[in-house]
Amino acid sequence: MENFTEQKGPLGLYDPQFEHDACGIGAVVDIKGRKSHQTVSDALSIVERLEHRAGKDAEGKTGDGVGIMLQISHRFFAKVADELNISLGNEREYGVGMFFFPQNEHLRAQAMKLFELVTRKEGLEFLAWREVPVDPDAVGQKARDCMPAIWQCFIKKPAKVSKGIDFDRKLYVVRRVFEQASNGTYVPSLSSRTIVYKGMFLVHDLRLFYADLQDPDYESAIGMVHSRFSTNTNPSWMRAHPNRFILHNGEINTIKGNTDAMLAREETISSPIMKEDMNKILPIINTSGSDSAMLDNALEFMVMNGMDLPLAVMITIPEPWENNKNISQKKRDFYQYYATMLEPWDGPAAILFSDGDVVGAVLDRNGLRPSRYYITKDGRMILSSEVGVLECAPENILVKDRLRPGKMLLVDTVKGELVDDDKLKADYASRQPYGEWLDSNLIHLRDLKIPNERVPEFAYEERQRMQKAFGYTYEDVKNTILPMARTGAEPTAAMGVDIPLAVRLPVPWAATPRWPC
């Protein structure tokens, strides 16, 4: 049985820091927020037509990962509640959690009991567990061998807590406390607004594996899907997408610096919203996850601390603004202000995101992952890695376009509107006097008076000894280090190794005359 929370470290030629993915993404959204089973079915049809973007094993029976994010269907779960003999209340007055437990019954019972205790300790009412009806025969043998026990839980919203983000924030604290106390259990989702169904499937297996997705009573206005192609990553149930807020195609190539920076901030971090709960949810980033899971951790943290999801995405994955002379001064001030607080999470990557109310898509500023979308006359937005994944009559197409680097496509299902990128960003850029704040508080390094003292240097013999000890070669110094020192530019040199094999060298390699002077 797979341990869903275990960190897999370097082994042989494998190192998790070099993992990359190339995946298929898609979404169907009813812009007016009208829920239907048709949206669920259409989203599943999209992912089934992204088979060429989904990885599979040599036998062709186990996939790298497929999943779907939906709104919680009150009609469906009210029926489930009757079967469980519990009362859920009205829509969004309860949370639904999806759990991947160990198959071992004793370990599963321990984890369930622990979660119930944590829930009650955090002031919430635990209602019931539900074993999710699945068909193990729908998946390959390798997926069955590491398949978790899949359960759902139901939690009642306290009367004093508001619907939406306030209740989800309480559920977030419960989940984080449980995750840090539990070993071997993974929580794909725990929310009052969204739910995630996923696993190590082939694209056609998702619909067949989860009976919930076949039920005509399961209705949603939002369906986001993902098919995973792990180019050099070990597939697992945990690493299938969607995550709790996002799914993505590509990779985050700045992930090490991003996660290190988030960790460093934890020493001084505070929140007027989380208050004393802040210590319960740290660390922000679960470093055993994939790059997209870590990005999801960061976005989730910002949202739970009061930031709108579109705003969190805007400052995490900014458009190319620094050398763009065509953007307004207000927008430039906005990006510069947040750039002092958060480093960009750069891809190449295409991101789909949702909190159950809004659905958005964005390309990072590299713009190297394709995403195309339709807006239809009957009020739907259809987006995918490529066109043709869902049949749509030409006369029903109102807008046909593609995502552009740094630009955001956003649908607000509560207001029932498609939000223009320029209008959205102009609104956020105008909410605070960012320019005044920068003028009053920003300090540039070039303005600091730094003593221009000569840096001590090693004598020739000592420098050569140190260079040998730390593996410096002549090419390192000539082609990389010296140009960096002279120009301040990032290293771009690259060349093959033309040194003879060690067994053919007359003297040890380190003693050969290739060292800088």
Predicted regions and their residues:
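Conserved short alpha-helical segments that host acidic/polar catalytic motifs at enzyme active sites
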Residues: 1-517
